[in-house]
Regions:
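Terminal (often C-terminal) interaction modules
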Residues: 224-279
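Helical scaffold of the NTase/Pol beta-like nucleotidyltransferase catalytic core
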Residues: 1-21, 51-53, 279
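Extended, well-ordered alpha-helical segments in internal regulatory regions
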Residues: 186-195
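Catalytic metal-binding acidic patch
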Residues: 22-24, 28-58, 73-78
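Conserved NTP/Mg2+-binding pocket subregion across the NTase superfamily
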Residues: 54, 58-175, 179-182, 188, ...
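Broad structural signal for hydrophobic residues in well-ordered alpha-helices, predominantly aliphatic
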Residues: 9, 13, 63, 207-208
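Short, charged amphipathic alpha-helical segments flanked by flexible coils
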Residues: 196-227
């Protein structure tokens, strides 16, 4: 899939394509054919052009219609040296994915250009993860424009809070959605604490090693569900017992962290998210 995507972007972008990278689990390990995304990172020559976004979008849309499940999961991150250094806005390379590029990016084509990428600070990773969670996991009723590209898998009906409170709805969406909803908070906690991306397995092991790890059985089970789907009854029962506990733990942790870096408005959004979750 990535070879096909790289070829398509080479044809569309020509010499402006400096480098292409495998990202995510295809770079740092832990890829699951059942649930994992196919992440591609592109670095283009400056200057950024007005038509770049549409070019990237059109090629990605065409590739996603290739007919396979993996084709549908393609996610493309892109920028130029100036956007990746933070000198100008544009492109699509959130801090978490920039860190992934720096630490794990696997060069697929072109010349390695990661020296032009600014390493995000830990507070930036915390805030970016929190903003993504508010959009993707149901805390924000409306996602700001600059964040819409960050959460392409966000459910259109914005009913994730209902999924958390009524686990049978979440199970009915399939193992990909199910494992993301369970394991994203675990991964965000790991990054907030360590300043690292790492694999989902590493993040889960870090979480489970703690003396206080709410929903430990659910986190352990979700790792297995990435490889083999659970039975509906098994998953629904476990989610019903532990999913809200996991989210309350994650939200409370991040309220404290966000206040510590003077992001009071974002912390307040998390507090409102908690209230809606428990209503």
């Amino acid at each position: 899939m990535l070879a096909k995507a790289v070829s398509a972007y080479r044809a569309a972008l020509g010499p402006r394509l400096i480098a292409g990278y495998a990202l995510g689990s295809l770079a740092h390990g832990g890829f699951s054919p059942l649930v994992s995304d196919v992440d591609l990172g592109l670095i283009l020559q400056d200057p950024l052009r007005a038509k770049d976004r549409m070019t990237i979008y059109k090629v990605a849309r065409s590739l996603r219609t290739g007919g396979s499940t993996l084709d549908e999961r393609l996610s493309v991150f892109w920028g130029t040296p100036s956007t990746l250094r933070g000198q100008r806005r544009g492109g699509r390379f959130p801090p978490l994915d920039r860190l992934d590029l720096l630490d794990y990016g696997r060069l697929l084509t072109g010349q390695d250009a990661r020296s032009s990428v600014a390493r995000p600070e830990q507070a930036e990773l915390l805030v970016a993860g929190a903003e993504f969670a508010l959009g993707y996991l149901g805390g924000a009723q409306k996602l700001p424009g600059r964040l819409r590209d960050w959460a392409p898998l966000r459910p259109r009906d914005d009913h994730v809070l209902n999924e958390i409170r009524a686990p049978s709805q979440l199970v009915s969406r399939g193992p990909r959605r199910l494992t993301k909803v369970v394991l994203f908070p675990v991964r965000f906690l790991f990054t907030a604490e360590t300043g690292q991306v790492g694999t989902i397995t590493l993040a889960a092991e870090h979480y489970l090693a703690k003396a206080y790890a709410p929903a430990a059985s659910l986190v352990t089970a979700a790792l297995a569900w990435r490889l083999e789907p659970p039975t509906d009854d098994e998953a629904t029962a476990l989610l019903g017992r532990e999913l809200v506990l996991l989210y309350v733990h994650y939200i409370d942790d991040h309220i404290t962290r966000l206040r510590a870096v003077n992001r009071q408005r974002l912390a307040d959004s998390f507090r409102r998210w908690r209230a809606r979750l428990l209503a």
